[in-house]
């Protein structure tokens, strides 16, 4: 290759590599590396789209009950197994009806196009099934807060998350291991 052609192609090659690296970094910033679910940043754009396009949309906030105890008793690898199992169950439950994400720690979130099209009891049941880790059945339980976006004065994601959060804490206060709609 002559020097003139190399001088022309080298910057283009550099920009192509930079673009590829940038694309991979952006994608990894939008996916949780442990669970494979969307991160808050990746989930938010999808949830905003969902609640503005679907009048029967709902936002669910899921928090694992007694996760710290599980982590302290069985170790962090067991805690990771519980998070991965929860993510898989939540993602399977959402299916084509919505999108799931991990907010951080042991908090998960979903945006569902139509809550009436899915079985909330099936989610609660799935979240309370033990998961196997290293030959041990780890007990899992979760509290779920539900906000039907149509019941909000203005359909805003921040308000839906706040209402789902309040409902989730009400479910925790009631007895844990359950779901509760926003009031």
Swiss-Prot record:
Record Gene3D superfamilies: 3.30.70.270
Keywords recorded for this protein, A-Z: Plasmid
Statement: the UniProt record of this protein carries the keyword Transmembrane helix: no
Pfam families per the UniProt record, alphabetical: GGDEF
Superkingdom of source: Bacteria
Keyword Transmembrane found: no
Domain GGDEF: 55-183
Task performed by this protein: Might be involved in pSAM2 replication control.
Protein name per its UniProtKB record: Uncharacterized 19.3 kDa protein in repSA 5'region
């Amino acid at each position: 290759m002559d020097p003139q052609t190399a001088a022309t192609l080298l910057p283009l090659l550099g920009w192509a590599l930079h673009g590829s690296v940038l694309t991979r970094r952006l994608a990894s910033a939008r996916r949780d590396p442990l669970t494979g679910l969307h991160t808050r940043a990746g989930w938010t754009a999808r949830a905003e789209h969902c609640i503005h396009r679907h009048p029967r949309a709902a936002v669910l906030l899921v928090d694992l009950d007694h996760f710290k105890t599980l982590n302290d008793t069985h170790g962090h690898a067991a805690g990771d197994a519980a998070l991965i199992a929860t993510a898989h169950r939540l993602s399977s439950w959402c299916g084509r009806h919505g999108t799931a994400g991990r907010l951080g720690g042991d908090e998960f979130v979903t945006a569902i196009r139509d809550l009436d099209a899915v079985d909330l009891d099936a989610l609660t049941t799935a979240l309370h099934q033990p998961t196997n880790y290293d030959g041990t059945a780890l007990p899992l339980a979760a509290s779920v807060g539900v906000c039907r976006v149509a019941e909000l004065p203005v359909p805003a994601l921040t308000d839906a998350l706040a209402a789902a959060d309040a409902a989730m804490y009400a479910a925790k206060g009631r007895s844990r291991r359950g779901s509760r709609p926003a009031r």
